Amino acid sequence: MTKLIIHLVSDSSVQTAKYAANSAFAQFTSIKPKLYHWPMIRNLELLNEVLSKIESKHGLVLYTIADQELRKALTKFCYELKIPCISVIGKIIKEISVFSGIEIEKEQNYNYKFDKTYFDTLNAIDYAIRHDDGQMLNELSEADIILIGPSRTSKTPTSVFLAYNGLKAANIPYVYNCPFPDFIEKDIDLLVVGLVINPNRLIEIREARLNLLQINENKSYTDFNIVQKECLEVRKICDQRNWPVIDVSTRSIEETAALIMRIYYNRKNKYNK
């Protein structure tokens, strides 16, 4: 079995490059690819970090990057190292543009339906739904990522977004003065990420939620001191275990998920050395 290193470089989630790689390698039963994922590469600083990794582990590079400056830097680097650097859909886009007479506006996405990646995504979505809000804790070992945080810190939508990118994410709420699941006392080899938020912002979100549900009796849910303690306690739990913490106060769901994916793949790439 021939082993081959593949670097997947993308300004989004690397799923397009991953689809293409899986489909292509399905034609080579004697090749065992080792995939290194480099998602959300959107500036030269991040790209340079990836280039240093590629230099230390030579392999074929597949990329989907819209920014022309980043594309040029990547292809020039690979050319100098004499390693293949392939735009996953660049040839397709160029041919469509030539045939239609319409200039390229931006890089488009595409899918290979019903392949292994497709079904992995479905399984990840199913997992996220079944393990939402602290459910089925006995199956946490199957997760790629576990999110913890106070109520209304976007754990559920972030879990679903991660699932659409093929990652199994469970989420567990932290409630002040309530026992936290004992999994945190175990030596688990899983990525656990804490989500926190500015207390004032969290109170606004919770008040809007209570108004929507026409609930007026849950005072502790929007009490500043309690909300603040919840966020501080989550930070404390994570700091004690060297788990990363993300402040979602000014981040969209996509931005939060992208940061988590970067942490996840950096961790995975490190363990694959």
Swiss-Prot record:
Record bears the keyword Repressor: no
Binding-site residues for ADP, renumbered to this chain: G149, P150, S151, R152, T153, S154, K155, T156
GO molecular function list: ADP binding; ATP binding; phosphotransferase activity, phosphate group as acceptor; protein serine/threonine kinase activity
Catalytic activity, reaction form: N(tele)-phospho-L-histidyl/L-threonyl-[pyruvate, phosphate dikinase] + ADP = N(tele)-phospho-L-histidyl/O-phospho-L-threonyl-[pyruvate, phosphate dikinase] + AMP + H(+); N(tele)-phospho-L-histidyl/O-phospho-L-threonyl-[pyruvate, phosphate dikinase] + phosphate + H(+) = N(tele)-phospho-L-histidyl/L-threonyl-[pyruvate, phosphate dikinase] + diphosphate
Record family assignment: Belongs to the pyruvate, phosphate/water dikinase regulatory protein family. PDRP subfamily.
PANTHER family from the UniProt entry: PYRUVATE, PHOSPHATE DIKINASE REGULATORY PROTEIN 1, CHLOROPLASTIC (PTHR31756:SF3)
Protein name: Putative pyruvate, phosphate dikinase regulatory protein
Species whose genome carries this gene: Rickettsia felis (strain ATCC VR-1525 / URRWXCal2)
